[in-house]
Amino acid sequence: MKRLLTILVALLVFSGTAFAQEEGDFYDDGYIYEQNGAGDQYFKADLFANFPLSFGDRLFVGGGFTIGYYRFLNSLIAVGGEISPTYNVSIGVKSLIMVPITLGAVIVPTIDKFEFPMGISLGITTSTFDNNQSYFPSFTAKAYVGGFYRLNESWSVGLSGYFLWTPQFFADAPEKNYHGLFATAGLSMRYHF
């Protein structure tokens, strides 16, 4: 009898575990994950074609690259700077080399894993034409737009384009003043940390 009573009590105690359901450790605190946040940073690298817009047929399509660093102030706005050496060749096979160094701000709206940065930056450019005429510094303004796909937490790749305005002003010969206008289109990648 004692043995039967012990078996019945054991079955009664442990029978509840046969019907128990496991509920995971799910906890919803209402937090929505944001791709970028205040303090996030990224390095960027662009490789692009450089299209001269204000030189007629005297300057051919060239190329260049950009290396930049940006830091987010909040989930939408980042500030930083970049350097963008460019190269074009003229009809007389003379080279125009420009090195703009700019500081600016970028607005980065996101949709799921896609980011669409738009920004403006100001700075200076050193220019050399045919290795014998150097102009330094020149004012530079740059507008930027791009589209990126976030591969993972650290890397994103995409397409980007710039509009670059680099005027040349001469105090002693104002008739030589010139507004250099360039557009770029290229491939980009960013490392986020």
What do these predicted regions represent?
Residues 1-4, 21:
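Positively charged n-region of N-terminal signal peptides that target proteins for export
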Residues 4-14:
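Sec-dependent N-terminal signal peptides
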Residues 20-73, 78, 188-193:
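Short glycine/proline- and aromatic-enriched beta-strand/turn motifs that initiate or cap beta-hairpins
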Residues 36-40, 56-62, 92-98, 134-140, ...:
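Transmembrane beta-barrel outer-membrane domains
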Residues 51, 63-142, 149-157, 188-193:
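Gram-negative (and chloroplast) outer-membrane scaffold detector with strong preference
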Residues 160-162:
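Internal, hydrophobic beta-strand segments that form the core of beta-sheet-rich folds
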Residues 166:
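Acyl-donor (CoA/ACP) binding surface of acyl/acetyltransferases
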